[in-house]
């Protein structure tokens, strides 16, 4: 409105905490869900189908593949040492060919001490990830500095685009049906709700962690592409085309 100045400086910061304290807002969010929270609390209604990451694009699995080309962890850290509305989110993804599988997730409103503990616990759960990407923002560098002697494979991730730009970059992977979520995981519904509302949901940590995982995976996927196999497929296609042409000539 005219003359209104929004003094908030961080994503998820409350406008009037003296009227609606953090605990009350969190309780409302849990009861309403991500979709209703965006409409009722943020006054940002979003269509059920639409936006960058549409709900009906996701694929689902009940059993993981026996092996992957590689597995990695992705972490989105909070901005403060105190428990606030900002979430810490860690995800594990397995990559096999053109497909990716969401293996597990841990998420909470933690200070840096609890965040470090959760990173250690998550890293010790199978299937194990050799690389663990942490965005070079918020508490990310501090967590790496604290845990580098305890947890192997911690790597800084330096985003080259905005949150929306990153989501647009990986959206075609979802739209093409190459991203699989665990059908029965309790956190999947909240993940898809946040993704469907992105970037208008109050919290975007799950989407940010997801996009970071897939952008970090791009160079690793190129390493696992077998050029000989691709050449074999192309040669096979040429032979089949030649056979069809010869058959037509005989007719």
Write out the residue ranges for each language-model feature.
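Short His-Asn-centered micro-motif
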Residues: 75, 134-137
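Nucleic-acid-processing active sites and adjacent nucleic-acid-binding tracks
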Residues: 91-134
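Conserved phosphate-coordination/catalytic loops
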Residues: 52-54, 109-114, 138, 161
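Gly/Thr-rich phosphate-binding beta-strand-loop-beta motif of the actin/hexokinase/Hsp70
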Residues: 65-95, 209
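C-terminal nuclease/phosphodiesterase catalytic domains that cleave nucleic-acid phosphodiester bonds
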Residues: 35, 39-44, 81-85, 91, ...
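Conserved inter-motif catalytic segment of the P-loop NTP-binding fold
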Residues: 5-19, 103-104, 118-122, 147, ...
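ATPase catalytic-site recognition across NTP-hydrolyzing enzymes
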Residues: 2-77
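A general structural signal for well-ordered alpha-helical packing
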Residues: 38, 71, 87, 116-119
């Amino acid at each position: 409105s005219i003359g209104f100045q929004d003094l908030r400086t961080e994503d998820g910061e409350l406008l009037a905490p003296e009227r609606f304290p953090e605990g009350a807002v969190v309780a409302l969010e849990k009861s309403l869900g991500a979709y209703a929270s965006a409409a009722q609390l943020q006054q940002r209604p979003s269509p059920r189908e639409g936006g960058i990451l549409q709900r009906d694009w996701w694929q689902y699995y009940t059993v993981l593949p026996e092996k992957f080309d590689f597995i990695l962890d992705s972490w989105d850290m909070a901005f403060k040492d105190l428990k606030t509305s900002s979430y810490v989110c860690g995800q594990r993804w397995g990559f096999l060919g053109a497909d990716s599988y969401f293996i597990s997730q841990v998420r909470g409103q933690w200070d840096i001490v609890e965040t470090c503990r959760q990173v250690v616990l998550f890293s010790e759960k199978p299937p194990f990830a050799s690389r663990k990407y942490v965005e070079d923002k918020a508490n990310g560098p501090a967590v790496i500095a604290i845990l580098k002697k305890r947890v192997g494979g911690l790597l800084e991730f330096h985003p080259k685009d905005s949150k929306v730009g990153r989501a647009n970059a990986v959206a075609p992977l979802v739209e093409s049906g190459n991203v699989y979520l665990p059908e029965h995981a309790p956190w999947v519904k909240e993940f898809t709700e946040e993704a469907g509302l992105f970037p208008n949901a109050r919290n975007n940590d799950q989407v940010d962690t997801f996009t970071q995982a897939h952008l970090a995976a791009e160079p690793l996927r190129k390493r696992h592409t077998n050029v000989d196999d691709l050449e074999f497929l192309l040669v096979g296609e040429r032979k089949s085309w030649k056979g069809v042409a010869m058959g037509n000539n005989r007719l």
